[in-house]
Amino acid sequence: MGDAEAGKKIFVQKCAQCHTVEKGGKHKTGPNLWGLFGRKTGQAPGFSYTDANKNKGVIWSEETLMEYLENPKKYIPGTKMIFAGIKKKSEREDLIKYLKQATSS
């Protein structure tokens, strides 16, 4: 499922303006995504989240990211992420494959 190289291109085009992925990377408009998988929503240390994000209480996984990345504002009403989402399932699969590799050791 998914192509990490294609996912990296999607990340650069649609995500990198607001997010970093490397360990110790700085927060931008959005949080650094290192350690994303297995972490609860709203828990990246040092980032100021909305209550909606903190209170959602789901664990980030391939499944939850598939749903979230399709329509972030529907999945977490009140999130400050202004991204409209990625409608194509194959693009979400590629992006998640890339994130899985890029955000963990």
Swiss-Prot record:
Keywords associated with the record: Acetylation, Apoptosis, Electron transport, Heme, Iron, Metal-binding, Mitochondrion, Phosphoprotein, Respiratory chain, Transport
GO molecular function terms listed in the Swiss-Prot or TrEMBL record: electron transfer activity; heme binding; metal ion binding
Binding residues for heme c: 15, 18-19, 81
Similarity remark: Belongs to the cytochrome c family.
Protein name in UniProt: Cytochrome c, testis-specific
Tissues where the protein occurs: This is one of two isocytochromes C found in the testis. The other is identical with the form found in other mouse tissues. These cytochromes are assumed to be located in the sperm.
This protein's record includes keyword Transcription regulation: no
A biological-process GO annotation: hydrogen peroxide metabolic process
Gene Ontology CC terms: mitochondrial intermembrane space; mitochondrion
